[in-house]
Curated annotation (Swiss-Prot):
A zinc finger (unnamed) spans 17-53, 90-127. Gene3D superfamilies: E6 early regulatory protein. Belongs to the papillomaviridae E6 protein family. One of its GO terms (cellular component) is host cell cytoplasm. It comes from Bovine papillomavirus type 1. It comes from the Viruses. This is Protein E6. Keywords: Activator, DNA-binding, Early protein, Host cytoplasm, Host nucleus, Host-virus interaction, Inhibition of host innate immune response by virus, Metal-binding, Modulation of host cell apoptosis by virus, Transcription, Transcription regulation, Viral immunoevasion, Zinc, Zinc-finger. One of its GO terms (molecular function) is zinc ion binding. GO terms for biological process: DNA-templated transcription; regulation of DNA-templated transcription; symbiont-mediated perturbation of host apoptosis; symbiont-mediated perturbation of host ubiquitin-like protein modification; symbiont-mediated suppression of host innate immune response; symbiont-mediated suppression of host type I interferon-mediated signaling pathway. Forms homodimers. Interacts with ubiquitin-protein ligase UBE3A/E6-AP; this interaction stimulates UBE3A ubiquitin activity. Interacts with host BAK1. Interacts with human FBLN1. The lineage of its organism: Viruses, Monodnaviria, Shotokuvirae, Cossaviricota, Papovaviricetes. The gene is E6. Pfam families: E6.
Amino acid sequence: MDLKPFARTNPFSGLDCLWCREPLTEVDAFRCMVKDFHVVIREGCRYGACTICLENCLATERRLWQGVPVTGEEAELLHGKTLDRLCIRCCYCGGKLTKNEKHRHVLFNEPFCKTRANIIRGRCYDCCRHGSRSKYP
């Protein structure tokens, strides 16, 4: 597969990681784009996030901010939006949860987690299948 056309359309290609300052690999740049991250600007430089640093950052968030379990209904009331309109990210990989992933939480009575500054986190399909990553601690 030729990655030249991809490099022109991906805003993360050629950027460094915000935390480790290493250049993003093509896979990391692609993941940033697919997970709908925003390019971060610090001191005039543009940054993305490599997978290792992102997962370390999310693990630190889980350790430092004890999450409070909330239902989908409570999350809606807290933010004044329907679950479908809320931006909820995975607490393990940082990807945006799809409507189906949010509805899976409700269907299986798996709570979302309210963390720092009322940020709502959940688990995406990739991070909850096969029991590979537990529910939010």
